Amino acid sequence: PCGEIVTSNDNANRKTVFERLPDIDGKWINIGRLDLETSGLLLFTNNGDIANKMMHPSSNISRKYEVIIKGSFNDIKKEQCIKGLDIGMSETGKFDSISACKLTANKYIVTLKTGKNREVRRVFRSVGCTVIKLKRIQYDNIKLNNLLVGEYRYLTEKEIKLLSIPFEN
């Protein structure tokens, strides 16, 4: 949920997403992060190898976001976002795809395969747009679907088999 930090131990004593998870033998490991202003799908595991494989850039795993922006966005800017832009700190950010939602103005579905810090926000900022709302709706083949804010569930066997990385039980 927005306003909850994705860390298991916060020195500033802020609310963390880990407080919502059940107790397990071992520890929960987050697969990726969301910033404080972003909501949506987070995956957790107790297997460090799985977490590392799913987050490593060489795994080429896609993440899909629903984004509402403020500012003018046209085909030229869309092309720039797909080709890649300087997003500061000597980094290039780019989207693998971007499509407009037909029913809502300034709402887009963005897919990318890199997980740079605040990359979606930084790419849109590079073309003069501000992200108003950002929600991760998919990570690899796992979709958020109708899961409510703050809820969790375990992956099904079918979902585990759909993961892009080899997985052994």
Language model regions located:
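Basic, flexible Lys/Arg- and Gly-enriched helix-loop patches that mediate nucleic-acid binding at interfaces
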Residues: 1-169
